Amino acid sequence: MNRRISIVAVVLIVAGVFTVRGVFSQAPPQAARKVIKLAGGPISAPFSDAILAGNTLYLAGRIGIDPKTGKVPEKIEDEIKLLLDGEKEVLAQAGMTMDDLVYVQIACTDLSLFQKFNPIYASYFSTKDYPAREFIGAGSLLAGGHFELQAIAVRK
């Protein structure tokens, strides 16, 4: 009787080990991935405007270029609005809004522009629960831009 119990115990342990190995050795299923690329952008480069992976949207760096001229406007306020309007457009293609942003990084060529940037930035949100954010200094940016924004959003 004890021998039979010992054999059953060994069989159960071996079966358990193989089951656990099988469960933990399988890679998790990959989240569906959708590329978001705005049509008619002024710069043709080898990157997407954003990648939607599951409920998370990874937004590429964006500068405030006028899509009609392909240039950064002279007025700083106009550049900021173009930058944020572009972010809104990318978010909308993923079925999201600015309020879905969870992390924002802004690179700026002149940190004295921080005070001009903030009120315009804040006006693009319908809530005061702003995303985590950093505002960092940068040497120079493409097309003579003063700001470059990259972000992560999570669908609510």
Where are these regions (language model features)?
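N-terminal presequence-like segments and the immediate start of the first folded domain
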Residues: 4-85, 89-102, 107-156
